[in-house]
Amino acid sequence: MIIANNDCFALQTAHTTYLFRKDAAGNLLHLYYGESIELDEGQLASVCDLLQPVIKNPNGCSLIADTALPAQCLDDVCLEISSRGKGDMREPFVELVLADGSRTGDFRYESFEIIDGLQSPDGLPGAYDAENQAQSLMITLTDRNSEVKLELIYGVLEECDCITRYARLINGGEETVRVERLMSMQLDMSKGALKINDFHGDWAREMNRNETILRSGKYINDTGVGFSSNRANPLFLWADTETTQDYGDCYATNLIYSGNHREYAEAGGHGKMRILSGINPDFFEWELAGGEVFCAPQAVMTYSHRGYQGVSRQLHHFVREHIVRGEWKHKERPILINSWEAMYFDVQEKKLLRLAKVAAETGIELFVLDDGWFGKRNNDASSLGDWYDNKEKLPEGLAGLSQKLHKLGMKFGIWVEPEMVSEDSDLYREHPDWAVRIPGKEHAFGRNQMILDLTRQEVREYILESMSDVFTRGQVDYVKWDMNRNMSDYYSQALPTSRQGEFAHRYILGLYQVLYTLTEKFPHILFEGCASGGNRFDLGMLCYMPQIWASDNTDAISRASIQNSYSYGYPQSVIAAHVSGCPNHQTLRITPLPTRFAVASVGILGYECNLCDVSREDMEEIRAEILLYKEWRSVLQFGEWYRLYESSEKQSVYDTDVTRWNIVSPDKSKAVGIMIKGQTLANYAYRTFRTKGLDAGSNYHFYNRSMRYDIHRMGDLINTMAPVHVKQDSLLHGAISKFIRLDGEKEDKIVSGAILDQCGIPLAQNYAGTGYEQNTALYQDYDARMYFMEKV
């Protein structure tokens, strides 16, 4: 709900209130964002009067922007938007260079409008409201130094406690203005210190959560690689310094954008904090001619007094209901097998069909043909852009392979990388000017490839035509849309010299145009985004593709950390995760198959290994995993995902190397608990599993996934039980292991949701080096457990 009264504005969600007002000089002052304040239109002005600081005397060395407020310095107040040149020395929201070369911005309030529905920026993806219950507020400001207007557009999504924001510049004059910065959101707060959370990394090391206390100076989270990047995800959280997972004031913002971005947290000199998020100004400028409009990307922000978990719940709801769209929004996603780690580039139809038949027998539903099927593609040095079938590998082409896979009862998926071109390709030889490179200068290659210039209409048309042909002739059910290099040599041969600073943003606009057209043309295809893993895992891509490959690192222990960090702002229904072979191809780590499954099950499950080479025992395990996942798929994909005691704040110092999750069905009738161990500790026998999110007034049947263990796990300790001596790893040891398995522990209790959530229940005793009994839990390094809860 939006309330406006004279010069005061309130954005009300179910549990939060956002207040700001116009001052006597026309500046917009931010007053409050936090827990809900009950107020109506008649109370709004008096509440704003109470919250507005009374300034009688200016601070030393302050600059006074307007004689109407002779004591007010803009550097010492909380503002809705900021610019340079009038006394606010902090990072600005907007920066313009006018025709005379001046840079001072002085935007003052002009008018407001309340609009039914949610607004989105032109040419960019944005949040939507399928129920059409949202409202938007548009505030118009005018620059006193030019004829430029600035529109601030707020959207209120009451049920998920989220507010969307973006800005629009309109040049109402005749002279061209250069835009050097236009952010998407600003939040000024009277806070002396904040705990900043950002998520950084690199290829195969995405989403490392970094927590920093900021008391002075600036904290910057940004990327200049051309895309949202694995180096700095646009998800950005800040909280009071005492905030925990479940308690305390916590805020978050995320950007609905896939290009270069920057998030600032700045501690000013007067006990105030400023948060900014938007396009990275270091890689951006825009010529705004008379009559033209420029829109910044949309951002979302949220607040919860229930700590990081509260913010996560709200962002998960926002992504599921207001970002992901189309046929697959609420539809259960199929279990897939991907050919990449099984074959890499060495794809042949016979090998593919052999793998597909084995996969179909296990219950896998979708076969994905990864890289290597097109042009003359035998390695990563050629053929990107040449999207015709390699008939040496696929004698009957995609159409023939697809038909055979469909006859097996499987869906057919294909890997493509449409934004790229190889120097050794027919496309590049015909259109060298379509590549992003500076003519006559040495080019920086990545993975032996270049980026196609999506700022050009003819390039976008080529991608649309070639991909439409691939999807149609292949009768494709699923597309993995990859992008495997960062931008370099920013330059378009189609742009004039004065507009080269627009290239990076224009590229993203071109990409969105392509994605919109294809997803509208092929609404039944399940699209999965990928960018060497998580190099473009963002809300912008999720507006077109309902799931994204989270990381090229398929190691279960690495993935547990990566997926745990994604959970701060993204639900598991958008995270693609695979069970791969061991030793893992990225880390060479060996982890048990049940652990690999447990981690990958919290997301969109796939397998990425050569099932034709899997042992009989492992094949039985995989069949059991797939049956289990299908039974619990709706919970695992669309349930509420809770982190259980993520940090050491509620764990023993001996128990911090454990990841715990709980996924609860929307109606709280079912839940899945997961515990993933790191390295095993000696003499640590007892653990408790405590849940979150259950119905306190109901009883649940709590039980675990039963396990049986190979006796090799006990080594020569088998001789403490065997009637004859058995040499470790001998033929006799191997023969015994074929017939005898050790039963794992069994958990089987009826317990209330209140006890599970508030107390937790003790689990079976771990093996601790002092003896083995019938119900002892045998934990080795990197083991995992899955627990199930059903209302009774």
Which residues does each PLM region occupy?
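Short Pro-Gly-centered flexible turn/kink motifs
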Residues: 95, 104-109, 286-305, 781-790
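Aromatic-lined carbohydrate-binding/catalytic grooves of carbohydrate-active enzymes
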Residues: 328-465, 478
